[in-house]
């Protein structure tokens, strides 16, 4: 069942009209785009690089494949996939936010990554790609910002080739009480202050902390993927479940 049937949704802890969420989320990422990479390193103490490395390893990309890096933002995963798939493959970096796409494009071009990457501004709920098109889809730290997650998961299934794999890297639920308490303290007391110091925008990082708490937990997201039609769905917790990587296949 789509989570948008009541015509309302969550923006952090606030309940809003569903059609307003995309614009509000866009405002958050327009605000933080220029400092996004710096904040990722600071607020995760660099651990996000380990989470992303595990995602790349789990994807099993090979030369010649077509990869969709959805909500790919500043292009961390795209850069790594580009090197793996080579000249015969293609990575599509897609994001709904044009500010994030601009930062990603400039960053990758500065690194000399140009030949096998294209950029598309796209809404995850209605992907503008043909059926059965991609070998691999990744969405890293993006699904929780989508208004209708069920629609997005169904759209990803549609554009995957049979045999293709979806990997969802996302903040999730810590598994132990002490970690939950430390994580809550950090998220709601420390993180907004970091956001204020580095990006001059505490409110956006308060939203990001709230959006993590409102995102489905590990087993709920697994069920959502299965309900959409993905098979062999499983997940791996990292850093005690602060982050989880979900994997599912289209057959």
From Swiss-Prot:
Binding site for S-adenosyl-L-methionine: 74, 95, 123-124
Record CDD domains: AdoMet_MTases
Pfam family, one: Ubie_methyltran
GO biological process assignments: aerobic respiration; menaquinone biosynthetic process; methylation
Keywords: Menaquinone biosynthesis, Methyltransferase, S-adenosyl-L-methionine, Transferase, Ubiquinone biosynthesis
Annotated metabolic or biological route of this protein: Quinol/quinone metabolism; menaquinone biosynthesis; menaquinol from 1,4-dihydroxy-2-naphthoate: step 2/2; Cofactor biosynthesis; ubiquinone biosynthesis
Reactions that this protein is recorded to catalyse: a 2-demethylmenaquinol + S-adenosyl-L-methionine = a menaquinol + S-adenosyl-L-homocysteine + H(+); a 2-methoxy-6-(all-trans-polyprenyl)benzene-1,4-diol + S-adenosyl-L-methionine = a 5-methoxy-2-methyl-3-(all-trans-polyprenyl)benzene-1,4-diol + S-adenosyl-L-homocysteine + H(+)
Molecular function terms, GO-annotated: 2-methoxy-6-polyprenyl-1,4-benzoquinol methyltransferase activity; demethylmenaquinone methyltransferase activity
Disulfide bonds: none
Matching InterPro entries: SAM-dependent_MTases_sf (IPR029063), UbiE/COQ5_MeTrFase (IPR004033), UbiE/COQ5_MeTrFase_CS (IPR023576)
EC number: 2.1.1.163, 2.1.1.201
HAMAP family noted in UniProt: MenG_UbiE_methyltr
Function (record text): Methyltransferase required for the conversion of demethylmenaquinol (DMKH2) to menaquinol (MKH2) and the conversion of 2-polyprenyl-6-methoxy-1,4-benzoquinol (DDMQH2) to 2-polyprenyl-3-methyl-6-methoxy-1,4-benzoquinol (DMQH2).
Family membership noted in the UniProt record: Belongs to the class I-like SAM-binding methyltransferase superfamily. MenG/UbiE family.
Record protein name field: Ubiquinone/menaquinone biosynthesis C-methyltransferase UbiE
Species, as recorded: Shewanella halifaxensis (strain HAW-EB4)
Lineage of source species: Bacteria, Pseudomonadati, Pseudomonadota, Gammaproteobacteria, Alteromonadales
